[in-house]
Regions:
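Short helix-capping and inter-helix turn/linker motifs at the boundaries of alpha-helical repeat units
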Residues: 194-197
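Luminal/periplasmic acceptor-recognition loop/helix of membrane-associated glycosyltransferases
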Residues: 191
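Conserved amphipathic alpha-helical segments that form helical-bundle/coiled-coil interaction surfaces
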Residues: 110-187, 199-208, 217-232
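Short linear motifs at protein or domain termini
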Residues: 1-113, 119, 239-243, 247-251
Length: 251
């Protein structure tokens, strides 16, 4: 029991208003309602929408610029952006970078995990998740010439597939590499003229295999898909034996 005069509860820590502004905008970007390259609004518009003062908005924007979720153009207008890998990466992902994990190691582990995901998904996928994958394909069709947006949709495709596996350990296991894979896919779509079409072909074949509950074809196409990234890197002059940090830094 609390003694007389002794506080039973700790004070509630209320987040500063600028942090709430930053979190509100961040949620829109992460949810895909605000896509990379789309205008966020002027400072004056954000002041009016959030009902806070200009300094609060500016501080919130500063946080988002530091995290890479907002950028300014030459006229100082604000746009949603895609963070670089080190801003995506947390926990284990950051340890990968600090320990100079190579892209070869990332590719090998991704190959093992994603083929296991594909095999289980072929057995367990539902009509609802198939519909999500098909919707992802429709959005990807519209983003074929937009490397950053297409790379985000590629991540979404594999996230949906992981849920289809019904195995939460695999879902968690793939998260660190998933965070680090975004810059690689964006780089390929930007620098390899055939990468987007090859990605589309692989995703289409994987969906067809899942619809037929064909484990062998799902695994085969996933293996081809992941191996294709390795070949793509070599074609644009990247070494998969370089550390992840160096691979991105030299892009």
């Amino acid at each position: 029991m609390a003694e007389a005069g002794q506080a039973r509860f700790e004070r509630i820590q209320v987040a500063p208003a600028y942090q709430l502004v930053a979190e509100a905008i961040e949620r829109e970007v992460i949810a895909g309602r605000l896509l990379p390259g789309e205008p966020v609004g002027t400072e004056a518009e954000l002041v009016r929408q959030f009902g806070v003062n200009r300094s609060t908005v500016r501080e919130g924007i500063r946080l988002l610029e530091q995290s890479g979720l907002i950028r300014r153009d030459s006229s100082r207008r604000l746009f949603a952006a895609v963070p670089h890998y080190d801003r995506f990466a947390g926990g284990i992902s950051r340890a990968f970078v600090l320990n100079e994990i190579t892209f070869r190691e990332l590719w090998e582990s991704t190959l093992a995990i994603e083929t296991a995901v594909a095999e289980l998904a072929a057995e367990r996928i539902t009509d609802a998740i198939l519909a999500e994958l098909e919707d992802n394909m429709r959005k990807s069709e519209k983003a074929m010439k937009k490397p950053s947006e297409l790379a985000l949709l590629d991540i979404e495709f594999h996230d949906i597939l992981a849920r289809a596996s019904g195995n939460r350990v695999l879902q968690f296991a793939r998260e660190p590499e998933n965070k680090l894979f975004f810059p690689t896919t964006e780089m390929l779509f930007r620098r390899n003229a055939h990468a987007a079409e090859r990605n589309k072909a692989a995703h289409t074949a994987i969906i067809e295999a899942l619809r037929a509950h064909d484990k062998a074809q799902a695994v085969l196409w996933m293996r081809r898909h992941i191996n294709d990234w390795k070949r793509g890197f070599e074609l644009i002059g990247k070494s998969i034996d370089q550390a992840i940090d160096r691979t991105y830094a030299e892009d």
